[in-house]
Amino acid sequence: MAPGNEVFRVVDIAVKATEARPGAQIVEREFGMFEVHSTSQADVLEAGEVVLSRLGLTMADRIRPQVVSTQVITRIDPYQAQLINRFRRGSILVSGETMLVLECAPAAYINYACNEAEKTASIKLIHVSSVGRFGRMWLSGTEAEILTAKNAAIQALEALQGREGA
């Protein structure tokens, strides 16, 4: 969301009006991002409705996501894998695997794309960044699984409705 400082107010609205709890909150000058979590999906959906209502917005006001770049890199070299893994925690890219780099705008939609990719293919999430102007994810796996994940992520983003972005 923009400006980033609005995240403080919006998280406050969501957690005080519902049973959802904050899961992430990142604030930058231009853009900010937040997540709410609950064991009940209804609580999370209610938090979204409450926030939109308080901001005077509806789902129709959202910006339609755009895929801005995709790269599929096959047979990752061991040295490149080492560079990519340097600051990783959790899943790592293994030499010989295939890597997908996908970027979209607005940034927050990358979380949705990643979720849809993980549902359809046996892949590893290496990196996801959903703050700033563009969201980015790096996935790894076999070439076939990465192509399946790529198609699922792109189809999911392209299926979302909204107004054209700025």
Each model region followed by its residue ranges:
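Helix N-cap motif at beta-to-alpha junctions
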Residues: 37-44, 140-146
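Preference for long, well-ordered alpha-helical segments
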Residues: 120, 127, 133-141, 145-152
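A generic structural motif
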Residues: 31-37, 134-139
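Positively charged, small/polar-rich N-terminal and surface patches that mediate targeting and assembly
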Residues: 3-23, 27-31, 39-98, 106-114, ...
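Catalytic "initiation/cleavage/transfer" segments centered on a nucleophilic residue
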Residues: 102
